[in-house]
Amino acid sequence: MPTRLLCLCLLSITAVADAADHLRDLQTAAIKNGQSPVAHWGVDPKNYKEWGSHSNRLIPVYTFGTLGAGEGVDLNSYLGKNSAYRSEAKLKTIYSRVPSNTLNLAAEYCDQTDLAALQRAAFKAGKKHVILMVFDGMDWQTTRLAAIYNERRVCYSEGRGTGTHFQNYTANGTTQFGFMSVAPLNDGTDCDVDTQTVKNPGGKHPGGYNVAKGGAFPWSPPSDDIYYLTGRGPDGKGKGEHPYPDSANTAQAMTSGVKSYNNSINVDYAGQHVPPISHEVQAAGFAVGAVTSVPISHATPACSYAQNVDRDDYQDLTRDLLGLPSSSHSMKPLQGLDVLIGGGFGDTATKTGDAEKKTQGQGKNFVPGNIWLTAADRNTIDVANGGRYVVAERTAGANGRESLLAAADRAVSSSQRLLGFFGIGTAKGHLPFATADGDFQPAVGRANKIESYTSADLTENPTLADMTAAALMVLDKNKKGFWLLVEAGDVDWANHDNNLDTSIGAVNSGDRAFQVITDWVEQHSDWNETVVIVTADHGHFLWIDLPEGLIP
């Protein structure tokens, strides 16, 4: 081959490779250089990773099976003229007060607690299946990030947009779009997990939403007080007017309808238990379940069913989820979920050494070993030992998808419950992170670390889509119906790491799970008897500066 032609071929191959991993290169350069012309996290465009936590941004809501479904089920029951933020009385019901600068007579947004009201209204209206899908940490900007990459074009600058299945799917004309405030009741509440008590009801930093500072829409540009949405003062120091939310309080708002303090798991401001929807519908004969790509009793899946004053009491939260005696239900355990599938496998710690920080929130009854599920509890719930759960867990040499679906089939045929326990112990128990181009080779992030996975990590774990399919198999055996929470938790983990590459991959992984849900509805149900809500619990603080730069 002539030298010139060989060089051209090599250049062409290199260009294809670069295009195929464009986001990895973009992310790697951003971390190396400390800035990127394409995007940044925080208030300073010249500091790519200025902020690595949550924000108080308004969050998009996508509903399916709701348009024209009647008062309380139709999303418009809570938007625009019906917004709680236009009414002092409604704000007092939500916050027990009218927070500073939170009344907004022009508000188009609803409150996060309205999603619980919508779910309850759906069951009251006779719906058989209600599914709440939470893309943890996925604000409007994160969705747009993935949509631009997927579409290979800048296709919108406001509104619902296109580029993912949950944006494009119409559910036979029954889909709706809106957005909500996710402000917490307060931050700074101190708790005692051993006594399950709140030490300072009301905390130290009351919540609310100031539209003049936060914006009227999820896509609003920054205000003059750019620090407001991150809970900081106007100069970036100290406490701002309102705190940003965490994943516990925000999940609880959607599962119970009660706004509470950051770190709460289905308890009110004073630590008193509040019933999540799952308890109510389970008592009425429905099946209930939770699925997540992160550990099984992380904040969002914990809020599907458990009750605890602190989100970090992981082992006790898992006990609630599985119907075992816990610190919050020691005398009368909860019934437990019918299906629980998620991560946490292999994530272990003791009370000594470097691992102590992983156990601090768990109280005196922490059992050294797996942080999320003790060996004794795992054995107790297994049908092999007289328990109620068919257990599928990561097993050396076994295909994770196949073992989980086989266990789901056994659970259906034997009328048993299902526990799926997977993950990577060296990666805090989560499933492998997919990246923008669909491989599993994450780029470096805020922590200046790169996760790497073995072939066993990839084959021995199912995907979130696989987990969702297994959950639907088991829950569908209850002919009365079911309630299900599905969490794409890795979106939040990617955004905490200021990682564009894994953020897109996480959104798309979750989107594939949503595709499983819509396929199931079309094949086994319809949009007259099923309601699905897709949303996030909270956002982060990503800004896309040059959207065209995301296109390979």
PLM segments and residue spans:
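A short, compositionally biased domain-edge/stem linker segment
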Residues: 107-121
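Hydrophobic h-region of N-terminal signal peptides that target proteins for export
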Residues: 10-18
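Short, conserved helix/loop micro-motifs enriched in His/Cys and acidic residues
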Residues: 248-265, 301, 492-494
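A post-motif C-terminal structural segment
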Residues: 20-75, 82-85, 96-107, 123-124, ...
